């Protein structure tokens, strides 16, 4: 059986992102522009099925002013 623990983390990150985006009334397109990426990629991330790089997680943290990495380390 393949280890998919990253999928569980990715889904938690997606939920946190969606909550913050809702709080900020931020669209996927707006977040993509801030991150320097595409709306399509942000959509994939928000589905919780994207294996995120540290660089991407850092960009998300900076753009949404949330902590992802520290919380995921504490939950591991």
Label the model's feature ranges.
Residues 27, 53-56:
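Residues that mark the N-terminal boundary/hinge immediately upstream of a DNA-recognition element
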Residues 25-43:
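Short alpha-helical DNA-recognition segment
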Residues 1-19, 24:
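N-terminal flexible/basic segments that precede or flank functional cores
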């Amino acid at each position: 059986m393949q280890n998919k623990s990253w999928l569980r983390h990715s889904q938690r990150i997606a939920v946190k992102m969606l909550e913050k985006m809702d709080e900020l009334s931020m669209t996927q397109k707006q977040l993509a522009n801030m991150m320097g990426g595409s709306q399509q990629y942000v959509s994939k991330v928000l589905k919780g099925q994207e294996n995120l790089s540290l660089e991407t997680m850092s960009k998300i943290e900076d753009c949404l002013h949330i902590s992802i990495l520290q919380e995921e380390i504490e939950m591991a």
